């Protein structure tokens, strides 16, 4: 699966070496199988109903959406409390 990153996403991940390392590991897994059960990929509801989320680790999440041509655009990354 092809992915792209919003400018806000790039800013959030830049400068956090630990989070960035975890992210690149999960990105490889996501591009191979976006709905792998270990990622816990799920559709959001409420004010974020247009977005999806998957887990980087116990507390860190990535928010993204699918485009019409089946690409994923990552829009936010952070702790559960930061992104929801």
Question: Which sequence ranges carry the predicted segments?
Answer:
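Alpha-helical structural elements of signaling/regulatory helical domains
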Residues: 15-19, 36
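Enriched for short, Lys/Arg-rich terminal
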Residues: 2-4, 11, 18, 55-84
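A short, surface-exposed loop/turn module that caps and links secondary-structure elements
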Residues: 29-54
């Amino acid at each position: 699966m092809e992915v792209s990153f919003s400018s806000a996403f790039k800013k959030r991940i830049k400068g956090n070496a630990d989070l960035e390392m975890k992210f690149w590991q999960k990105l490889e897994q996501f591009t191979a199988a976006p709905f792998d059960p270990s990622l816990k990929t799920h559709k959001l509801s409420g004010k974020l109903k247009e977005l999806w989320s998957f887990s980087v680790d116990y507390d860190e999440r990535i928010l993204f959406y699918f485009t019409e041509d089946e690409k994923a655009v990552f829009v936010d990354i952070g702790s559960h409390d930061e992104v929801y």
